[in-house]
């Protein structure tokens, strides 16, 4: 019988996660989440009827958590892409601060929590829409479309357009024309917004093997597509006013914002080379964020004005 010395045995120490709270917050894509929360809030407040403030808060919280879960699962699947892109190389997974299994578990737990909580406390119709939104973003867009087609952001944009629809369903228990209009505005806003980004980040996307439109069709075709989608966006965003769904404050603001965005888009279309072209794309990308926030802020203002008028009547 032999004696085994203690130094002959190597014990593998369990891996201790180096992730901080900030790393897990980064997995949620907080900047994207802020836009989701705001558009969802507008959808919820525009919905007819009354929803208890606690249930309203719960609805927005669940939608926000669901959006964050989608972001975490997106980063889990795209760690190889993120590592190759300057814009995303410092994210928690490529930097080794969060492991892929940790990100996957985090995303799945948050997805389950957000859907089940919304279903139990608010209604299962809204919960089903939230589950579909998460599925569409993670499976249809992230896993399938993004690496396969240059139209990834066009089709995948539906996921980003659904939060106000989910919020409306949470408040009203059903859907009508208005949430579909909100969906259409965000849906047609998404391609010019992301293609403007892709124009000045084309090298990043090419290095990562992502078939964004500037990589597959070239910058000139992308500029034309941005122009065409912006024209459609301006028309779709304005339409609710003459159709009688939103009021004059919204309609006039929509025209002003749309006109400015169209001017910036024409500038992108005209400037084809050099630093001026890159600056034009950056300006359009930045303004497009302001455009959507401002448009939905005016809708929120209309809700407040209607409430004040109703209280005084």
UniProtKB/Swiss-Prot annotation:
It holds the Pfam family UbiA. It is an enzyme of class 2 (transferase). Keywords: Cell inner membrane, Cell membrane, Heme biosynthesis, Membrane, Transferase, Transmembrane, Transmembrane helix. One of its GO terms (cellular component) is plasma membrane. It catalyses: heme b + (2E,6E)-farnesyl diphosphate + H2O = Fe(II)-heme o + diphosphate. It is a multi-pass membrane protein. The keyword Mitochondrion does not apply. It is found in: Cell inner membrane. The keyword Cell inner membrane applies. Belongs to the UbiA prenyltransferase family. Protoheme IX farnesyltransferase subfamily. The gene is ctaB. This is Protoheme IX farnesyltransferase. The chain crosses the membrane at residues 35-55, 56-76, 98-118, 120-140, 153-173, 180-200, 226-246, 248-268, 285-305. One of its GO terms (biological process) is heme O biosynthetic process. One of its GO terms (molecular function) is protoheme IX farnesyltransferase activity. InterPro entries: Protohaem_IX_farnesylTrfase, UbiA_prenyltransferase, UbiA_prenylTrfase_CS, UbiA_sf. NCBIfam families: cyoE_ctaB, PRK04375.1-2. PROSITE patterns: UBIA. Its EC number is 2.5.1.141. Converts heme B (protoheme IX) to heme O by substitution of the vinyl group on carbon 2 of heme B porphyrin ring with a hydroxyethyl farnesyl side group. It comes from Rhodopseudomonas palustris (strain BisB18). Pathway: Porphyrin-containing compound metabolism; heme O biosynthesis; heme O from protoheme: step 1/1. Carbon 2 of the heme B porphyrin ring is defined according to the Fischer nomenclature.
């Amino acid at each position: 019988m032999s004696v085994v010395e203690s130094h002959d045995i190597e014990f593998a120490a369990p891996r201790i996660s180096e992730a901080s709270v900030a790393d897990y917050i980064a997995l949620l894509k907080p900047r994207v989440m802020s836009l989701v929360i705001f558009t969802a809030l507008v959808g919820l407040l525009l919905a007819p009827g009354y929803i208890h403030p606690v249930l309203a808060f719960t609805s927005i919280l669940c939608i926000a958590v669901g959006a964050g879960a989608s972001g975490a699962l997106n980063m889990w699947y795209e760690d190889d892409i993120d590592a190759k892109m300057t814009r995303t190389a410092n994210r928690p997974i490529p930097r080794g601060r969060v492991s892929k299994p940790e990100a996957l578990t985090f995303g799945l737990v948050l997805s389950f929590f957000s859907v089940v909580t919304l279903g139990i406390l608010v209604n299962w119709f809204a919960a089903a829409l939230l589950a579909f939104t998460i599925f569409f973003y993670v499976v249809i867009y992230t896993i399938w479309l993004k690496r396969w087609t240059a139209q990834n952001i066009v089709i995948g944009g539906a996921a980003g357009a659904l939060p106000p629809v989910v919020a409306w369903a949470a408040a009203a228990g059903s859907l009508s024309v208005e949430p579909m209009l909100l969906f259409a505005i965000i849906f047609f806003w998404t391609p010019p917004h992301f293609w403007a980004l892709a124009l000045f980040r084309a090298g990043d996307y090419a290095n990562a093997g992502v078939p964004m439109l500037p990589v597959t069709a070239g910058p000139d075709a992308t500029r034309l597509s941005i122009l065409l989608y912006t024209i459609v966006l301006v028309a779709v965003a304005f339409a609710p006013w003459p159709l009688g769904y939103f009021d004059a404050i919204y309609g006039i603001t929509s025209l002003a914002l749309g006109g400015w965005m169209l001017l910036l888009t024409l500038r992108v279309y005209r400037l084809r080379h050099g630093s001026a072209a890159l600056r034009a794309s950056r300006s359009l990308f930045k303004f497009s964020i302001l455009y959507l926030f401002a448009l939905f802020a005016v809708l929120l203002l209309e809700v407040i004005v209607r409430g004040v008028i109703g209280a005084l009547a």
